[in-house]
């Protein structure tokens, strides 16, 4: 299995099994040398764009963006 696919699978499982999916996503972003600003993602009225493991997703509010990212992750894992 390709390294990126394994990392994506592990990230997906961590997010699904976490108490706070958004906090877990943020931790994964930071672990992968990304930028995560908790105060930015706390505003449910902001347009948020998430990028991780070559998947980009957006939504109004971080929860919406994360749902979009998770849907795209599932699609990529099924390829």
Give the ranges of each region predicted by the language model.
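N-terminal segment of the canonical double-stranded RNA-binding domain
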Residues: 1-49, 56, 75-76
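Short, compact, well-ordered microdomains
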Residues: 51-79
């Amino acid at each position: 299995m390709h390294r990126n696919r394994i990392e994506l699978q592990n990230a997906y499982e961590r997010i699904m099994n976490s108490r706070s999916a958004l906090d877990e996503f943020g931790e994964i972003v930071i672990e992968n040398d990304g930028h995560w600003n908790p105060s930015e993602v706390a505003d449910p009225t902001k347009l948020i764009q998430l990028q991780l493991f070559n998947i980009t997703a957006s939504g109004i509010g971080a929860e919406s963006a994360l749902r979009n990212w998770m849907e795209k992750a599932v699609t990529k894992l099924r390829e």
